[in-house]
Amino acid sequence: MEKEAKTYLRIKNFVAPFIGLAVNISAYGTENIVPNGKLILTCNHRSDMDPFILSYTFPRFISWIAAEYTFRIPIFRDLAKIAGGIPMSIDGNISIGSIKMIQQVFKKGETLGIFPEGHDYMVKNDFKSGMVNFHSGFAAFSIRNKVDILPSVIIPVEETYSDIPIPPIVRSFMGMPKEVCEIKKRSIYKKVKVIYGEKIDHREFLSGTLEENMKQLSDVVRSRMIALQEGQYAEA
């Protein structure tokens, strides 16, 4: 992943000044970010700006899990591939090729970034509501590969809403799922807080069956992320 990491950092260094000008970003709990070693970074997902906001505040290379259909979007597809993006189907299925890429991320001691809500929050399109239910695939990655999880949240302080710039018929032609084609609005951040919580040790979730452990770990991560949204930094 060394080539991808270098490409990611070049893109980040180029984009960061523009992100910083467009959005007032404050980060809290950055002392919880471990400086090295394999890691899974989770975050809530309410805007297509989220990967850029999180990457802006996170000092390490992030290899992002992204919905498979996003790799059909011109420009994004090429950027995602050269910057270490890993495609995953929205139904939770993942190809052998993607599994090998994830294993390489961990073998190199890098960070895997994932949004456990998938695109469900944006499909719901109610930006005043709380987090939706999680998909538990990230918990399987953690348990099977013995990787700790760092929970984080993005809290909007100021945001506006605009129509999705790509018309539904074009989205459909690009092969996007029906529910994505029907999304009406997108959130555009003006001011946000990014909060990082304490690392969650995967070893506490190895004693039961994989299915039981996945649910328990997923529930713990979600509750920690909700606590971050409501905790000491929420009103900072």
Please place each PLM-identified region on the residue numbering.
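Helix-to-loop junction immediately C-terminal to a conserved catalytic motif
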Residues: Y8, N13-H45
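Catalytic-site beta-strand/loop segments enriched in glycine and acidic/polar residues
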Residues: V105-A139
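A cross-family acyltransferase "interaction/gating" segment
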Residues: D126-G208
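Short, basic, glycine/proline-bearing loop/turn elements
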Residues: V15, I82-I90, M122-D126
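Catalytic core of membrane glycerolipid acyltransferases/transacylases, capturing the structured
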Residues: P35-N93
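Hydrophobic/aromatic ligand-binding patch that stacks against planar heteroaromatic rings
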Residues: L54, L79, Q104, A140-R144
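Short gly/ser/thr-rich secondary-structure transition/capping motifs
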Residues: G20-Y28, N93-I96, G175-E179
